[in-house]
Regions:
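Flavin (FAD/FMN) cofactor-binding and adjacent substrate-gating region
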Residues: 44-78, 230-250
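Flavin (primarily FAD) cofactor-binding/catalytic cores of flavoenzymes
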Residues: 2-39, 84-184, 188-396
Length: 396
């Protein structure tokens, strides 16, 4: 039985770094908002155990308005240090610590649907509650956007699956695995598989592997480093500084934005992974052109005519934003959102073409640059959101 409850001024959907940060900033500004979601769920349930963050320490803090809920503060309170690179399980624990400190009002419940209303948005919860929100902030992450290459379209998930479908790769013990992809997710998954004693091969389309963080000393040259590198840690020298200023970045011609964004976020592995990849066959410059069941195994045909017979293909094939794939957006609402290649077209305040509907995180990257695809972009997103709402409330 549906239960109609009192309306609210704002709703935040998502309890990862962006949702938690937005809630903390809005609360500090005295702006009412209910926040729904399971804290750090994607990080815990859709990333394999044993992984580490590629971003450096300074770029991995979850932004808060008082700059007090840092990783350093977390370590001091917990009484132990977090190793570098940052282990995934410690980052998840840090996010939950942040939530307990700053967003205790979080409701660990699931939104069923969001639809347009005459004065805002109609919200329906899975548990039957219904209410209207004047404003909706979508910080739901990328879990709805996983890419499954068409070559694997007819292959059952028991034989081919996306990396985001797993929280522990040790389940593949006793099987032979091919990892498709050549970025951080692919390479670290391969390392974890080998360390678990699982035979693995990496197959990537590019002619060579790209790496980040091979020259850490360049980040510790004082004033010189600050000229070329931003503390946000997104992109190489020069580009790093540019993408750290979204309002400046978005003023450049679209072609330049696209080239700079690709250079900042192209598939690449962290330099600290290299020793862990020794002994793993890595086939580059090759593409899987077809995949088919063969008995209880999977046969992969590559574009050079070679074949692989494996027990499972792990698809580290990334994510492609398409906000119409968010299951909680009603079809009629999703159809009204102006988009470009799946990304919502956003204006100041990260607001979509539908007044009062905001998108934070990766969906904001087309409008505001690649910084919004990383934890370090949450400070900009939360600050911009608060400014927009405050400005609008002040004009009413």
């Amino acid at each position: 039985m549906n239960k109609r409850t009192s309306d609210c001024d704002g709703l935040i959907l998502g309890a990862g770094p962006y949702g938690l940060s937005a809630a903390a900033y809005l609360r500090a500004a005295g702006i009412e908002a209910r926040i729904f979601g399971e804290p750090m769920a994607f990080w815990e349930k859709q990333m394999p155990a044993g992984m580490c963050l590629r971003s450096n320490w300074g770029a991995s803090h979850i932004a808060d308005p008082n700059q007090q809920l840092t990783l350093d503060a977390y370590c001091r309170e917990k009484g132990n240090q977090v190793s570098k690179p940052i282990p995934l399980d410690r980052f998840v624990d840090y996010g939950r610590w942040y939530q307990q400190k700053s967003v205790r009002e979080l409701e660990n419940r699931q939104v069923l649907s969001i639809d347009h209303a005459s004065h805002g948005f109609n919200i329906a919860m899975v548990d039957g509650e219904e209410f209207t929100a004047r404003r909706v902030v979508v910080a739901a992450g990328i879990s709805s956007f996983s890419v499954r290459p068409p070559e694997f379209a007819g292959v059952p998930s028991s034989l081919a699956s996306h990396t985001s479908a797993h929280d522990d790769l040790r389940k593949f013990k006793g099987r032979r695995v091919v990892v498709v992809g050549a970025g951080q997710s692919a390479l670290e998954s391969a390392a974890l598989l080998q360390e678990a004693g699982i035979p693995v091969e990496v197959i990537g389309r590019g002619p060579s592997l790209n790496w980040v963080g091979l020259h850490p000393k360049l980040h510790h040259l004082g004033f010189v480093s600050r000229i070329f590198y931003s503390k946000r840690d997104v992109g190489p020298a020069g580009i790093s500084r540019l993408v750290s200023m979204p309002h400046v970045f978005r003023r450049f011609p679209r072609g330049f934005q696209d080239r700079a964004a690709y250079r900042a976020i192209r598939p690449a592995g962290a330099g600290w992974l290299q020793p862990r990849l020794v002994g793993i066959p890595i086939t580059l410059g090759r593409k899987v052109v077809s995949a088919a069941e063969k008995g209880s195994q999977l046969q992969l045909n590559l574009d050079d005519g070679s074949e692989r017979l494996v027990d499972h293909a792990l698809l580290a094939t990334g994510f492609r934003v398409d906000v119409t794939r968010y299951p909680f957006l009603s079809p009629s609402l999703a159809k009204q959102i102006e988009t470009f290649n799946g990304f919502p077209v956003l204006k100041r305040g990260l607001e979509s073409s539908i007044p009062g509907l905001h998108f934070l995180g990766k969906p904001a990257a087309w409008s505001f640059g690649p910084l919004l695809g990383f934890v370090s972009g949450a400070e900009f997103a939360s600050t911009e959101l608060v400014r927009s709402i405050t400005r609008r409330n002040g004009s009413n």
